[in-house]
Amino acid sequence: MSIHLKGLKPGDLGEVTLIVGDPGRVELISSLFTNVESVVDTSREFVLYVGEYQGRRVSVCSTGIGVGSTEIAITELLENDAQMIIRCGGCGAWREGINPGDIILNSGMARSEGLLSAYVPAVYPAVPNPLLLSQIHNELTSNHKTVHVGIGLTSETYYFGQGRTPALNTRIETPNLIEYWEPRGIINCEMETAVLYLLGSLYNIPVANCLVVHVSRTNEKWTNDEDYRRLHRESAELVLNAALKFVNTNTQ
């Protein structure tokens, strides 16, 4: 089934699929591959390349921003026999001491009650494969990356749902979500991971994330664009290394 990932068919994806929000990042990450092929080329926000990494078939696909388009992309990847999916993206840090350029691995995701309620009730946990997450953590720390592990929040909106104040209506009070969630153990916020974790559990495949911190919401310091691009490529390479080690360990 490939209604939106036009041209994708079973057998295309290989052993590991990375997903990113930005279609432009597909080209960046696929620069790590050899024998690169374009399977989906700018179908809405979806771009999908496949290639080889260390002699193994891998792929990278963009999902666009947010829950709706991400659910479409992940579902169609899963329906076309994705064996492992890892989100390589960005996030905002909500805890002091987590700095722009650091990396966050989420061991679970809080979410709004409406998020994917068509699939599961709100009490159903959104969690990664713990062994895959641990493998990624080991690879990152072995390569001297600053890594934080903890529970994140997947928001359905960028502005109100993350405590930002658009000039919508001054009579609408903007909730201070960081003040609410940070004492409850939430270390970061983004817009896609819970979808991946829920669908990974339902389809019974290993999933995880690896998020570059692009902004600290405690002091509004940002990673500059050049460093952000470099960090995404570096972290994606380490994620691929970890993913293939995970495959080797868990298929013997």
Question: Predicted regions span which residues?
Answer:
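Metabolite-binding pocket within alpha/beta catalytic cores that recognizes anionic/polar moieties
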Residues: 1-135, 139
